[in-house]
Amino acid sequence: MAIVLDGSSLTIEKLVRIARHDEKVELDPAALERIRVCRAMLEEKLKAHEIMYGTNTGIGEFSEVVLDDEQVKLFQRYLIYNHAAGIGDPASQESVRAAMASRINVHAHGNSGCRPEITRTLVNLLNKGVTPVVAQKGSVGACGDLAPMAQVALLMMGEGEAWYGGERMPARQAMTRAGIPVPGLEARDGLATINGANLLTAMSALQLFDINRWLMQMEIACAMSLEALVANMKPYDVRLHRLRGFPGAIRSAGAIMKCMQGSDLQTGKMKTKVQDAYSMRSSPQVIGAAHDAVAFAWQQIETELNGVGDNPIFIPEARLTLTGANFQGSPVSLPMDMVGAAVTMVSVLSERRLNRLTNPALSVGLPAFLTKGAGMFSGLMLSQYTADSLIVEQRILSTPASIQSIPAAADQEDFVSMGMNTAMKNAQILDNGYGVLGIEFMAAAQALDFRTFTAGKGVRAAHTVIRKHVRHLDEDRPLYPDHDAMKSLVRSCEILEAVEKEVGPLDTPN
């Protein structure tokens, strides 16, 4: 069944299905009628020569330049040509698909003033698998993602490039093969296609979905390391966290305890320290803080996905045109900067547990660097170096982009969100996070091989999956294939799926 885009019910999960799994979309009939009503009002205002920004005026510094009737017809074409000014490698196809879906949802409110043919064409592009080629770099996050979205708008004129059937080709060729008519651009159509923070929001939405699953795997790795380090289990009692009240910490402690169901540590059979180091016992608070950051950003992004990110905005029932700044990306870029920092923070915590697993002074009897042949062999010594190098890059990238505004357009656009930079750097932060977490998983599995007590059900399930991809390190071998295999394994979420099959969902309380 197609996902209905009605302007108010688009979730991150639905966006993932559209972007990654090619689920069909359908424009809600009531939304289509709203688009028609708004367009009719705009055309009446045009006939009356009422001044409307970006429709019969120039844009930015040229907003005071009024266009005559003939110029109005041509303006949208030149607007899109001018704004298709990105640079570099193309954005991923899933990101562009998500951006198009979010733009359809903006139009569904009936406040954008474009012709229905424009919105229908976006729907057809999604459903028939035609994806515009869009340079990822070039947006400053206000007025929205103008440069990348202009490359989407080029297809409305049969121009630009597109992916179709696994090939990159001229857009008109792709649309012809797919049987999609070229609608052309008339008054307002071009600006209504580009004037929102759609690509940065789309990328952020997909990242949040992945980060949530990464954090759940971080809890599994934490549980494995706690088992290997013979941890005192009192800090993970959910009652402790309920007394403080942070939802993320409550959730995280519950997930860790679920993974350790049936462990000799949980049943009190093992002698433990009275109190462990912060990198162990504060894991629920730290991972939980990241969960809370993700939850806030999730709310912000779903608000943006279901809001009217455009300028100007037309209100047909009041016959009103409002100009403002609903394209401004700050409501997304600010919380996503926080999320990027949260991923880095949790990666640092992971590396500190890795340190305790490999350091013989801290590992509660485990062999140095998790090898029996110390001296001849160095075990996982260099794995820590790799994790450290990834974290340094994460720290550099965690500098907020949302405070990096540079004035442009003759100071008419003198504060911008730089939200696209947030989205791009978060992609790299998360990619590094997959590597850091994969290395902790590998070390924890190696450490558990040296323990003889019974580990928890979830921990055992994770260990089994890891051993399908990376074998025990008996003697030194090149580790880069193992690191790459573990990074891919974390990205695939195979460990998460196996653990949840064994102990139930990790994102619900016990």
Predicted regions and their residues:
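Membrane-embedded alpha-helical core segments of multi-pass
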Residues: L126-V130, P148, E219
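Catalytic or ion-translocation cores adjacent to nucleophile or general acid/base/metal-coordination motifs
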Residues: D69-A85, R356-A368
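Cysteine-centered functional microenvironments
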Residues: V134-S139, E317, T321
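Feature of Fe-S/electron-transfer and energy-metabolism proteins
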Residues: R34, E64, Q71-L74, Y78-Y81, ...
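Polyanion/phosphate-binding surface patch
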Residues: E50, V65, S252-A253
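C-terminal auxiliary extensions adjacent to catalytic cores
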Residues: A2-E23, L27-R34, C38-L46, L155-N510
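Glycine-rich, flexible loop motifs
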Residues: A2-H49, Q76-V134, L226
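FAD-binding core of FAD-dependent oxidoreductases
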Residues: Y53-F75, H83-N105, A135-M157, Q173, ...
